[in-house]
Amino acid sequence: LHLKVCQFAQVLLNNGVQKGDRVCIYMGMIPELAIAVLACARIGAIHSVIFGGFSAQSIADRLDDAKAEYIITCDGAYRGAKDIPLKGVIDDALIGNKTIKRVIVCTRTRTAVSMLKGRDVWWEDEIKKVETQGLELVAPVEMDAEDPLFILYTSGSTGKPKGVVHSVAGYMVYTNYTFVNVFQYQPNDIFFCTGDVGWITGHSYIVYGPLSAGGTSLMFEGVPTFPDAGRFWDIVDKFKVNTLYTAPTAIRSLMGFGLGPIKDHDLSSLKILGTVGEPINEEAWHWYDEHIGKKRCPIVDTWWQTETGGILISNMAGITLGKPGWATYPLPGVKAILVDDKGNEITEKEDGLYRGNLCITQPWPATIRTTYGDHERC
């Protein structure tokens, strides 16, 4: 991985990318995506990964907001039985664009694509140039702790997408801390987060968290029900996965297929299960516990979001007790209270429970630093 990251870092340098430049990454869930992310970090470029399902207009909006000058993409990506024409979507997004200097295209599906002379280059050709030049080791660029590491745009469900900025040191310190402690990572564990690097879950718990701990991170391309509903369990069995971190929506979807897709797979390598992205209902929690964890794997129910950078509220596997449907308590160092709509701390129960708005009262290392180009929205 180190060699491949260095090689692609040199590709970026050869194509004019410098410290502080914004690089848009629009790729499928393949190793080259993680390599591109880490290569940007190595030379101090600010990566902005865009989820592979976004439309050309959504991409154009994000390119414009980030003032991006470089794009890394693929000819296509696989999603279920479909081939997604990523390069074609990028071409549409760039109609009228005046800022993009270079588009680097990685081969994945061998989909026919158009290549604009002077702008578009093939990943593989650029790697061959680096190998020929013998420039395969690139020293990491010195960075300030508060320099931006990446911009990640929220989905825009509450208006114009906002570019959440996370910093170099604080973000990586916190993703490492939460990965090691929440999942009780042990050397040689195989960690399988089923998320997408286009979202914060993939940034934090596919790329930066596991790799900063020297862990093995397993990436998944496609959907959990293709070619059949046993896809996750086949991966767990084949690669002897130790920790599985997935979304309640995926669990509920797989529940609908019954136990047939599970029965022919050996899940005994699993030690820890996790959920992310939304609350998990008790029925799904118990199904996950009984049929996937065989009632011997702690389930960590994690609460966090793009702006927090990493997990804030969760039980810690085998250390603190979990409860079906509850994220339980803030992690050590995280200070959380409930407040009413006027900001007053809630100290009395309502119908046996404390109810209010969650407020984190003290900063943590991965706190959002700003909203790119619009600090007032932060």
Annotate each PLM feature.
Residues 14, 38, 42-128, 247-248:
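Structural core segment of the AMP-binding/adenylate-forming
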Residues 22, 28-56, 66-71, 189-190, ...:
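A short helix-loop-beta submotif of the ANL/AMP-binding
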Residues 27-28, 48-64, 76-85, 170, ...:
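ATP-dependent adenylate-forming carboxylate-activation enzymes
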Residues 104-105, 111, 116-153, 160, ...:
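Conserved pre-ATP/AMP-binding loop-to-beta segment of ANL
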Residues 329-333, 344-378:
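Conserved ATP/PPi-binding loop(s) of AMP-dependent carboxylate-activating enzymes
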